[in-house]
Amino acid sequence: MRARYDDHPASRHRTSAKGCLAAHAGPDGRVSPDGRAPTDGSFLDRSFLDARVAGDRAAYLTDPNRLSYPNMRPSLLAFVAALPLIVGFALSGTHANPALPVVQFHDNAITSGRMVNGEHSLSLGIRRAMWHPYGEQRAGLEMFAFTAADGRPVMPAPMLRVKVGTKVHVSLTNPTDSTFVVHGLQSRRAVEDSIVLAPGESREVRFTADAQGTFYYYATFLGQGLRVGRFSDAILSGAYIVDGPGGAPKNEHVVVLSLIYDSRNPNGTASFSTELGVMNGRPWPYTPRLVYELGDSVRFRFINASNDIHPMHLHGAFYRVDSRGALMNDSVYSADQQRMSVTERLLPGETTSLVWSPERPGGWLLHCHFFLHTTPNIPYGAERKTPEERRRLRAEQHGKMDPNRHVLDEMGGLMMAVEIRPPAGWTMNAPTRRQLRLVLPDDSTSSDSSRLYTPSVGDGDRLTPPVTREGPGAPLILRQDEPTSIRIVNNSPEPTGIHWHGMELESYYDGVVGVGGTPGQITTAVMPHSTFEARMTPPRAGTFIYHTHLFETAQLSRGLFGALVVMPPGKDFDPTHDHIYIMGDTRTNGTSLNGLRALPPLQLTAGESHRLRFINITMVNAGLQMHLLGADSSTTQWMAVAKDGMDLPAHQRVMRAASQPVSIGETYDFEFTPVAPGRYLLQLRLPNGRVRAQQSFEVSARQ
């Protein structure tokens, strides 16, 4: 059944202490008058964790009272190890200051301000406050935050949400000793402007909400901007939503994405080893859980108020992209402009609105696919670790990874979970299936302690090895509408879990240990020297990805990823006219194309069409680009045919310049027909334009 992306009559938005947005409830369901959970530490008991390890998923995802986790060791496992160990210096005032108010969190559930004399009136102040991303019982950072009408500092900044045509009046005050520049509090059809707010200054701002869409406002120190790594001014961002005459839609979540840095490099720039990504002020696992029923339509507005790219990925389903915008403009798509996607790239300062109608129950992740932004949360402020302490922690934790604690110890940052409740009597069907194998090797030698996980693919008695032993793995070729079983054979000494990126399948098989599945059947790790059967029936032909979703730090960088191609009924994969290009990271070549920097030439014939499938599953290269140069060294043309495995509608299948950004977790399919003989060059380029890998197409004339 094809997903419906309209408002269902049964849709309902749960906002009670035991509902969709009950992220601030205490253990007994208590919610304080200001919407915060009790701060007596009572909701920090271990019952949820004990239940989680025992396999009771209801206590993890569906119980909103277990949202702050005890004993979350900051496990700087391996990615920070791969970063340069730069000795950063602490920001002034990063230790807890008991004299400062504490930043309160909210999820943009209500608009701030009220109507006064025909204007929507809103008071905003800026003040110093303590921000505790892991709860008030943990160390915090001294930050600047916008305040609500009652003077409380909040993150994100108070949401301004009005109907188009509303007159807005904002009172700004700055009682601090710093100068701030405020952006975004203005009409959208005017020339972009800003407000300089000096220490002790107050300003009155009036404008009309003259354009419908997803916008935002933000403040920075004088001389700073949104696209640089920010420190104590990094949480000064808020949503500004302008609805149509009908008002706000149901079941919508407005999410502000932020990155905060805790220390600087010697040259004064932000140290990425102290970067923390937050959704509405909190990182995973402190982000709210959303709970819906089958048939509900769920809407998201994402605002990238940070300095980096965020490819936002939904597990197990497609969402519809309804708009794309930025600070001063938003393109709300008409029906023929809308498209389906599983990963949407957001550049710094960009916004988007998405609609998802879930068709399968279970636990699903929605997260940034930039690996840096979902790694374990770093210790902040007084809990900060020195480089020496990091090395010691890595040595102590080597080989001690516990898959049952993966959701707590190995995941963090820009990630949230959505629970789709199964209807009464729901079961997974089990038709006769084609049998495939994904075989992970036991690859260790006395001279190499760093294992390679690059898998082979088995179909019957045949076992297809990867092209290179450093990744990617051999491609999996499936058939549309054919029930298929993929048996993961883990011959390695470490547990793993395989995610079928972009595939529409049951949550239990999605590959996220501790999140996937339904009560009574929880996704578990594929333990060493054991197997796991993943079942799927691909509803569409296209280009997808398989990759590890457990201990990604070690396994993704050592080859545990590959292409997953679904062919239409009656068609076989033809490698002479169908070409897979997967961008990944290897130990020898770093970011590469099919594991190589220089690929062997392809022999093509002028006038014959070829399908080029591009996949980005690198760890940190969210801004890679694919270019195809013609025989005259200028950019040639190709035709876009699919995005993330979903065929584009006919009116979007157009010839365009052969240049395409491909962010992490995205796939793109193009049809290329060389019109003239000669030497063409397919290039993988870094964001700065430097060529990272390439392959020549040697095109001969048709005989």
Question: PLM features: residue spans?
Answer:
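Surface-exposed interaction/gating patches
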Residues: 258-320, 348-360, 582, 586-631, ...
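Short aromatic-acidic-glycine turn motif
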Residues: 133, 190-191, 196, 318-333, ...
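Asp/Glu-rich intrinsically disordered low-complexity tracts
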Residues: 6, 12, 18, 22, ...
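Extracellular/periplasmic metallocenter environments
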Residues: 175-182, 186-249, 338-425, 493-496, ...
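N-terminal, post-signal-peptide metal-ligating segments of extracellular/periplasmic oxidoreductases
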Residues: 93-204, 235, 242, 250-253, ...
